[in-house]
Structures are given as C-alpha cells and as structure tokens.
UniProtKB/Swiss-Prot annotation:
Pfam families: FabA. Its main location: cytoplasm. The gene is fabZ. It catalyses: a (3R)-hydroxyacyl-[ACP] = a (2E)-enoyl-[ACP] + H2O. One of its GO terms (cellular component) is cytoplasm. Belongs to the thioester dehydratase family. FabZ subfamily. It comes from Herminiimonas arsenicoxydans. GO terms for biological process: fatty acid biosynthetic process; lipid A biosynthetic process. It is found in: Cytoplasm. This is 3-hydroxyacyl-[acyl-carrier-protein] dehydratase FabZ.
C-alpha cells in the first residue's frame, strides 16, 4: 500500500498554510485512484467567520480539498513534481452535491478516481465522507500549463 505523509505531500502540492487541505494519503494507485484525509480542527482560520455560532467547513473549501487530492494523484501518476514554470488550474466542476456538514473534530476522507485524461485535461470522480457518511460528491476537471502558456485556453 502506497502512503504519503505531510512532508511528502508538500513535495507534490504547491499549497501551504492556510490553503494546504490534504494531511495524509492513505493509499494511491498510479493512473487510477487515491484516498486521502483532511483533519478538520477547531483552529482552522475559516471557522472564525463561518460560522462563529455553528462552525462548518465552507463547501468551496471541501471542493478545494478534493481538487488538491486530484492534483496530487495526477502529479503522482505523471511521476512529476510541480515547479516554478508550471501551474495547475482547476477548470471545471459538475454535479457538486453537499450531503452533510463538516465540523471541527471531523476527519474528511477524500476518494478520487481518474475518469480520463485527454488533451491535457484530467477528469475525476471525487467524494468526501466523514465516519462513513457521504459529505460531498462532484466530478472535477483540471489541467496543467507552463507559465508561458498559462493564458491559453484549456485543451489547446
């Protein structure tokens, strides 16, 4: 079983505090799938304003956690680490549904499967769960560009 700790994750994802939303990879299979976790603590910055009386992880950050997990799978599949000359863009989302809130103390388990990779566009099926209960699901798309090509249209 292939796993990654936070130090290994930081070699593949350019995100840093407070935007790094993947804490550990439980398992991954190149070209297929990945399972990772985000430990949601009461100390998360976003809980200060979302919402002080009933803190819940913003849906957009749950999607971002899935997208980071997907990007991690792509980098691992390509055997490539990000560098100063490349950028990964999150370019699409379909069928996003939120099924339960994610609160302080929860562990968000993220499962991402590659559906396809064509013309430089990766498509994934992604889910997040807490204690075996589905919290969110979506299909995600992303692409990688060199800095010089970063303004070009996806897929070109």
């Amino acid at each position: 079983m292939k796993t990654l700790d936070i130090n290994q994750i930081k070699q593949y994802l350019p995100h840093r505090y407070p935007m790094l939303l993947v804490d550990r990879v439980l398992t991954w299979e190149s070209g297929k799938s990945i399972t990772a976790i985000k430990n949601v603590t009461a100390n998360e910055e976003f809980f200060n304003g979302h919402f002080p009386h009933k803190p819940v992880m913003p849906g957009v950050l749950m999607i971002e956690a899935l997208a980071q997990t997907a990007a991690l799978l792509s980098f691992l599949t390509m055997g490539q680490k990000p560098d100063d000359n490349s950028v990964v863009y999150f370019i699409g989302i379909d069928g996003a549904r939120f099924k339960r809130p994610v609160e302080p103390g929860d562990q968000l388990k993220m499962e991402v499967e590659i559906l396809r990779n064509a013309r430089g566009i990766w498509k994934y099926k992604a889910t997040g769960s807490v204690d075996g209960q589905l919290a969110l699901e979506a299909e995600l798309m992303c692409t990688m560009r060199t800095i010089n090509d970063a303004g070009s249209t996806a897929g070109q």
